[in-house]
Amino acid sequence: MSTHPIRVFSEIGKLKKVMLHRPGKELENLQPDYLERLLFDDIPFLEDAQKEHDNFAQALRNEGVEVLYLEQLAAESLTSPEIREQFIEEYLEEANIRGRETKKAIRELLRGIKDNRELVEKTMAGVQKVELPEIPEEAKGLTDLVESDYPFAIDPMPNLYFTRDPFATIGNAVSLNHMYADTRNRETLYGKYIFKHHPVYGGKVDLVYNREEDTRIEGGDELVLSKDVLAVGISQRTDAASIEKLLVNIFKKNVGFKKVLAFEFANNRKFMHLDTVFTMVDYDKFTIHPEIEGDLRVYSVTYVDDKLKIVEEKGDLAEILAENLGVEKVHLIRCGGGNIVAAAREQWNDGSNTLTIAPGVVVVYDRNTVTNKILEEYGLRLIKIRGSELVRGRGGPRCMSMPFEREEI
């Protein structure tokens, strides 16, 4: 049996271990004037969002899945006073704090939090200016004097409950991502410390992408279709240059994959990642949002003579998938049943963003009734969860989960 702490060679193998993040006070630091800045469209009610998330976690446990939490793993990674101090300094450096006295006050605030879990959760929640002591006039620098009425000294990280994106598990390796927006790129700091210092994961997992890269990639665009084939999305959040870097590293490090299918589709927020429009639910079945099919282009990428070989695939997507996965026929299950109104509405509510926890066993939001009925007609067993508040962040069950271990298929 493999001793690697990360083992993810498919999208559908029985899920054994998964990482989540329970929404916290970062959601209470959302306000209407700054939603776009923080990549939100609405403000979830935290109490109900936590109840929904707890039900999601319990549904996974009921299926035999071990649930880990990002905040706990990050806290366990601060294994010495030196590493703790390094974490605080790196967090402050990336927080874009305006004003030297403000930065000094926040440093003291964080150092004063003795419990590691509480410290991590505070860094996630952000810091309001009203939490800090008033700076004496004589100590203020120019930045302090001309500072705006923006209420935060450090922005919250409200997207953290979408644990799929800051890093992605690929085989026995991890892609520690550089994200599309500054407000989310800070989230990858927790993954850095987990895979560098955690007692179980630290120093034991190869990185096939690093957060220090200057091009962007996010985990919602990284899908493990089989032990031989990956899929990546060229999307609003992931660019082609990042994909090339990722693939060269995967092939050079012999992570185990032979081919990558790169999906190029519309670049906009409603299709922000590949997994918002396309997920694998069984050996031969995928959900798909019909609106992407017309303009979709698929490229096959292999590694030959120490360089990437890229060929545009021709023909029907179902045929391309069947050929590359070695199955007789692939069924594309269209969100909303292909009805233009139902498809648009249910894709917006993440009807295509499913989490497969075993072949043909899928976690979905209960609200997407049209799509769910069709999935059941295809013989899938659905685990339906409520998501009235969680969905306000524009993510579904796959977005909210990062597999650490799946059984091989």
Curated annotation (Swiss-Prot):
Matching InterPro entries: Arg_deiminase
Gene Ontology process terms (BP): arginine catabolic process to ornithine; arginine deiminase pathway
Record keyword Ribonucleoprotein present: no
Key words of the record: Arginine metabolism, Cytoplasm, Hydrolase
Pathway: Amino-acid degradation; L-arginine degradation via ADI pathway; carbamoyl phosphate from L-arginine: step 1/2
Family to which the UniProt record says this protein belongs: Belongs to the arginine deiminase family.
Protein name: Arginine deiminase
Organism name: Streptococcus sanguinis (strain SK36)
Lineage of origin: Bacteria, Bacillati, Bacillota, Bacilli, Lactobacillales
Gene symbol of the encoding locus: arcA
